[in-house]
Amino acid sequence: MKITKVAVAGTLESSDVQVRVQPFDSLDIEINSSVAKQFGEQIEATVREVLAKLGITAAQVIVEDKGALDCVLQARVKAAAMRATDEAINWEAVL
């Protein structure tokens, strides 16, 4: 999947995460979280795992975490990535 435009998913509410995805030459992940020292590596690993499953190798991803669970982070990364591409989405494979 190729990222062709800027897209955002999520909110800045407590227990949520806002993920911003935009075109970039390589894969760049920025994590802003009050619990980054404790969970930063896990957050980055989850983001990388979701991007790899979607076949994304070049994008800038900015994660504004407000204490979201891992399943919420996965859903937000998927949603932002799908909004940021012009490719057709195979919804049966996603769901």
Curated annotation (Swiss-Prot):
Tagged with keyword DNA-binding: no
Subcellular location: Cytoplasm
Domain of life, source organism: Bacteria
UniProt-listed Pfam families: ACP
InterPro entries (UniProt xref): CitD, Mal_deCO2ase/Cit_lyase_ACP
Predominant localisation class: cytoplasm
Any GO CC annotation of this UniProt entry: cytoplasm
Sequence similarity: Belongs to the CitD family.
Subunit structure: Oligomer with a subunit composition of (alpha,beta,gamma)6.
Protein name: Citrate lyase acyl carrier protein
Species this protein is from: Haemophilus influenzae (strain ATCC 51907 / DSM 11121 / KW20 / Rd)
